[in-house]
Amino acid sequence: MLLPKRVKYRRQHRPKTTGRSKGGNEVTFGEYGLQATTAAWITSRQIESARIAMTRYMKRGGKVWIKIFPHTPYTKKPLEVRMGSGKGAVEGWVAVVKPGRIMFEIAGVPEEVAREALRLASHKLPVKTKFVKREELGGDTNES
């Protein structure tokens, strides 16, 4: 599972999930991508589960890039504990995903295989997603 090697502070405030993603909105490494259309926290377990679903369907063919990383800790207080007396212990790590963010990319497989692999991965995630292709740069070149 993914988690940071070390952090400066163990606990953080909850991150905002409003607005659209500022970066990571284009397919950069692979040919096809899985883009979030809603906002959510995605845990390291969900990322790993989606990765396993994709690689199993592709039968170890092609290459997968994970473009999100769970940097943010989330905390939880024990059951039946009264409010107050500090923030709870770190329960796990999450990646904050906003609409427009490309979460996974795939290359080296046909489009049908990539579409199905990303569909299987999307079932493991708490966000609505859509399949996107890389937009090739070209055609409109300035030759002066």
Curated annotation (Swiss-Prot):
Residues 1-19 have a biased composition (Basic residues). Signal peptide: none annotated. Pfam families: Ribosomal_L16. One of its GO terms (cellular component) is cytosolic large ribosomal subunit. PROSITE patterns: RIBOSOMAL_L16_1, RIBOSOMAL_L16_2. The keyword Ribosomal protein applies. The keyword Metal-binding does not apply. It comes from the Bacteria. Residues 1-26 are annotated as: Disordered. Binds 23S rRNA and is also seen to make contacts with the A and possibly P site tRNAs. Belongs to the universal ribosomal protein uL16 family. This is Large ribosomal subunit protein uL16. The gene is rplP.
